[in-house]
Amino acid sequence: MTIVEDAQKGIITEEMKIVAKDEGLDPEFIRRGVAAGRIVIPTSPYRQVKICGIGEGLRTKVNASIGVSSDIVDADMEVKKAQAAEAAGADTLMELGTGGDFLAIRKKVIDSISLSVGSVPLYQAFIEAARKYGSIVDMTEDELFKATEDQAKLGTNFMAIHTGINNITMDRLKAHGRYGGLCSRGGAFMTSWMLHNEKENPLYANFDYLVEILKEHEVVLSTGNGMRAGAVHDATDRAQIQELIINSELADRAHKQGVQVIVEGPGHVPLDQIGTNVKLMKEMSGHKPFYMLGPLVTDIAPGYDHIVTAIGASVSASYGCDFLCYVTPAEHLALPNLEDVITGVKTSKIAAHVGDMVKYPDRAREQDLAMGRARRDLDWQKMYSLAIDPEHAKEVRNSRAPEDSDACTMCGNFCALKIVNQNYNLAK
């Protein structure tokens, strides 16, 4: 039985107990969430992974994406990025390579970390077709499903699969047009294949067969967002919503067959539309875990898109988004390097926490309360221990060391907190 089927039979599995302990919640709450499709717990029969729950009532989780490109193929560097992402606090990792030996590189990455690892199988299928036949449009349907199964057997825990692109979605896209084009690589591959071959998307047409593969290998389905906007002016358009409707219907079908499902959301969304997107997705999908790719709230800050994303991600999480894909400073410019990956994870972890302070004020604000008291008391060691990045905080302070060890060089002898502590008591 799958974990969904266990949960629906009233069985609390070891994975549910681990999530409950990690979140400080009752195991029965986790079981009910998995049974209803509101919580997923990625696992694999092929490898031991760090158990992580994603969904309603749980802390907002952060995914880091890595992977070689056709221009830069350095498997060892991708392993270092994966390990750095885990060390920086990423909850999951997606390996999205589009160059080199797909399975060999992915296996190397999977074997190097304990996190759940996700992938996009159609990248491999389409790019191998281009290598073999000279064009992505010559890929066969069998090759697409074989790539999916091959990646599942490696121990891939969740897969972004572009199930919601079909002929109806395509009609909406062509009729409405786009200011920023189609930014999803998977969406670009699949729509090009459909138009050239005059056929339906095989992932949609053969959805039940796809679900059989995922169920056999205990892979979480993440319904790919191939119609997401690549510019804020295209956000929440007809093609995006059409795909969401289809993916929500397919998510229900997969869950009824015992497969865990995450529904993916958009990546470029102006701030005033974030709440609408989260609420709409949650209602349409029956409150399945919602995964947002960023989101970016403006398009004019290349080089600073990790900051743009932190703004959007914190608001998304506050409205109920469960799962955030990080964005690095290299977004829209280059393949991220090691430092970009670390910065992306840290920035998104901050955003997730900020959102959780709104979603779960009783639970998520305890660390901030402790930090406030530590600052009041000028307890620097306590401040470091509570910081999201203790080593960075120490490094910054020590690089400009104060004469007075109680204060910092911002205020020096005129530290407001020290003055108050010397003259009266504000402890609470």
From Swiss-Prot:
One of its GO terms (molecular function) is 4 iron, 4 sulfur cluster binding. Pathway: Cofactor biosynthesis; thiamine diphosphate biosynthesis. It catalyses: 5-amino-1-(5-phospho-beta-D-ribosyl)imidazole + S-adenosyl-L-methionine = 4-amino-2-methyl-5-(phosphooxymethyl)pyrimidine + CO + 5'-deoxyadenosine + formate + L-methionine + 3 H(+). InterPro entries: ThiC, ThiC/Bza_core_dom, ThiC/BzaA/B. [4Fe-4S] cluster binds at residues 408, 411, 415. GO terms for biological process: thiamine biosynthetic process; thiamine diphosphate biosynthetic process. Zn(2+) binds at residues 268, 332. It is an enzyme of class 4 (lyase). PANTHER family: PHOSPHOMETHYLPYRIMIDINE SYNTHASE, CHLOROPLASTIC (PTHR30557:SF1), THIAMINE BIOSYNTHESIS PROTEIN THIC (PTHR30557). Catalyzes the synthesis of the hydroxymethylpyrimidine phosphate (HMP-P) moiety of thiamine from aminoimidazole ribotide (AIR) in a radical S-adenosyl-L-methionine (SAM)-dependent reaction. This is Phosphomethylpyrimidine synthase 1. It comes from Methanosarcina barkeri (strain Fusaro / DSM 804). The lineage of its organism: Archaea, Methanobacteriati, Methanobacteriota, Stenosarchaea group, Methanomicrobia. The gene is thiC1.
